[in-house]
Design a protein with these regions (language model features):
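Conserved ATP/PPi-binding loop(s) of AMP-dependent carboxylate-activating enzymes
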Residues: 319-323, 334-364, 402
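Conserved AMP-binding/adenylate-forming core of the ANL superfamily
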Residues: 9-53, 57-61, 78-83, 87, ...
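Conserved AMP-binding/adenylation subdomain of ANL enzymes
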Residues: 174-191, 199-240, 254
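AMP-binding/adenylate-forming catalytic core of the ANL superfamily
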Residues: 77, 94-96, 233, 241, ...
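ANL superfamily adenylate-forming
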Residues: 99-147, 254-255
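Conserved AMP-binding A3 loop
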Residues: 18-22, 144, 151-175
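Gly/Ser/Thr-rich phosphate-binding loop
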Residues: 213, 238-243, 254-314, 322-325, ...
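Conserved pre-ATP/AMP-binding loop-to-beta segment of ANL
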Residues: 5-8, 118-120, 134-155, 162, ...
Length: 461
């Protein structure tokens, strides 16, 4: 903020609104006055219920600057458990976006409810941003927190069971932001683009925290749009864009007339949040000529491994990030050698989350010696991580461990197949039998025999 106050920190394409580092500095100091007046201190929680917006990221940064704890919840994905989540967080302040149907939840919350409102650089701000205008924009209030105090709480979808919050300390958050900026290779003047929710860890690290600590610019959209995605990358001279495998599939299944030549500023797109099949990867690069990289991590372990764009090794996740120690263990907990397959452990002490915020409001500490990812994989001779499946998804057929992802990757090589999914079902003799489902491209319908023969050509009987 002091060295580049006029540089843009975040711009939202839907709002057509930008927030500079200088304006963020002023807003953060005003927000610090707002929180201090209400007596908030370290580990007191500010709950943010909002969609992607300039205001969202302004509050995120401002809360961390003051030293309180910011709790984020994806309203739509956690709708069934929202009241329980709010009760577990026990926020001192609830900042909410109007128009999301949150009235009942807000009424049941213990903390002070304040509409988020709109920030306008030229005046006429509303909600919170009108409320904080009476406070000084100068840096007169010191942070109330230390590095080991809680900085961020975020939630998973909660579609299977009651969701748990994941707690990062202020130090943990910073180390993740710094490691992410390092592997992305971004700094002042660089622009990244994201359209994923900032209620999720991945977007928080990659396109909020990494630009914040490096002085880069985040260009955001509220949602993904297949027809507008490449236009955004072109219009805003994006250097690095963030995708997930679903976006890659959508851009493959319904191609857009664009190529790398149309995007001269774009260095690469990086995919995360789920494994990217090698076939998807090669097909995307072949179709568009745009480099794809991949990264992996977890809510508990933070960003863990990633390619540095051009040094990508297709079919792998990439090497460990600078604060991470990644290793693989067998069923007895013994470390395995390079090339040997087992469960992947992320032992990034400085990037590892503190613990879980449980549904009853209690805190469950995470082990300090590493996070069991639940992923199966190995590390190759170049130090690149490979993920081959999930421990819980393993199909055990007649005593043989079969990774569904291995079968999926073969199925999608068939020219008629768009997507594939493999599961295990009970079998009276083998214990489990393999069953696979495929979604075919429009107008194509290969026979069962054809698909079985295709699999036999690449898989053992």
């Amino acid at each position: 903020a002091r060295t580049q106050p006029e540089n843009v920190f975040v711009h939202c394409v839907d709002q057509d609104k930008s927030l500079t580092y200088g304006a963020l500095y002023a807003l953060s100091n005003r927000f610090a006055g707002f929180l201090k007046e209400r007596g908030l201190g370290a580990n007191d929680r500010v709950l943010l219920l909002a969609e992607n917006s300039v205001e969202n990221l302004a509050v995120f940064a401002a809360t961390l600057r003051y030293g309180a704890t910011l709790a984020t919840v994806h309203v739509e994905m956690n709708q069934a458990h929202l009241a329980e989540i709010v009760a577990a967080i026990a926020p001192r302040i609830v900042l909410y976006q109007e128009g999301l149907g949150l009235e009942e939840v807000i009424e049941g919350a213990e903390g002070e409810a304040v509409p988020l409102g709109d920030w306008n650089a030229d005046g006429g701000s509303t909600g919170l941003f009108a409320e904080i205008e009476k406070f000084s924009e100068e840096d007169t209030i010191e942070s109330c927190a230390g590095p080991d105090d809680f900085g961020v709480i975020f939630y998973t979808s909660g579609t299977v069971a009651k969701p748990k919050g994941v707690i990062q300390t202020h130090a943990t958050a910073w180390y993740n932001y710094d490691a992410t900026a390092d592997y992305l290779g971004i700094g002042p003047g660089d622009r990244v683009f994201d359209c994923r929710s900032y209620s999720w860890l991945s977007a928080q690290h990659m396109s909020f925290g990494a630009p914040l600590v490096s002085g880069a610019t985040c260009i955001m959209a509220k949602h993904f749009s297949r027809s507008r995605y490449f236009g955004w990358l072109k219009d805003y001279d994006i250097n690095v864009g963030f995708v997930v495998p679903t976006i890659v599939n959508m851009l493959l299944n319904q191609p857009v007339p664009v190529s790398a030549r149309d995007l001269p500023h774009l260095r690469f797109l990086t995919s995360s949040s789920a494994p990217l099949l090698e076939e998807q990867w090669r097909a995307f690069e072949g179709l568009y000529g745009i480099k794809l990289a991949q990264s992996a991590g977890s809510s508990e372990g933070g960003n863990s491994a990633a390619h540095r764009g051009a040094d990508r090794k297709i079919g792998t996740i990439g090497p460990a990030l600078k604060y991470q120690d990644i290793f693989v263990i067998d069923g007895e907990g013994n470390r395995l050698k390079q090339g040997e397959t087992g469960e992947i452990i992320f032992a990034g002490g400085r990037q590892q989350a503190y613990g879980y915020l449980m549904p009853d409001g209690s805190i469950e500490r995470l082990p300090v010696d590493g996070h069991h990812s639940g992923d199966i994989g190995f590390i190759d001779a170049d130090g690149h991580l490979h993920i081959t499946g999930r421990v819980k998804e393993l199909i055990i057929r007649g005593g043989m461990n079969i990774a569904p992802l291995e079968i999926d990757s073969v199925l999608v090589r068939h020219p008629a197949v768009a997507e594939a999914g493999t599961i295990g079902v009970p079998h009276p003799i083998y214990g489990e039998e393999v069953v696979a489902y495929v979604a075919c491209l429009d107008g194509l319908s290969p026979s069962t025999a054809e698909m079985l023969n295709h699999c036999r050509s690449a898989l053992p009987e």
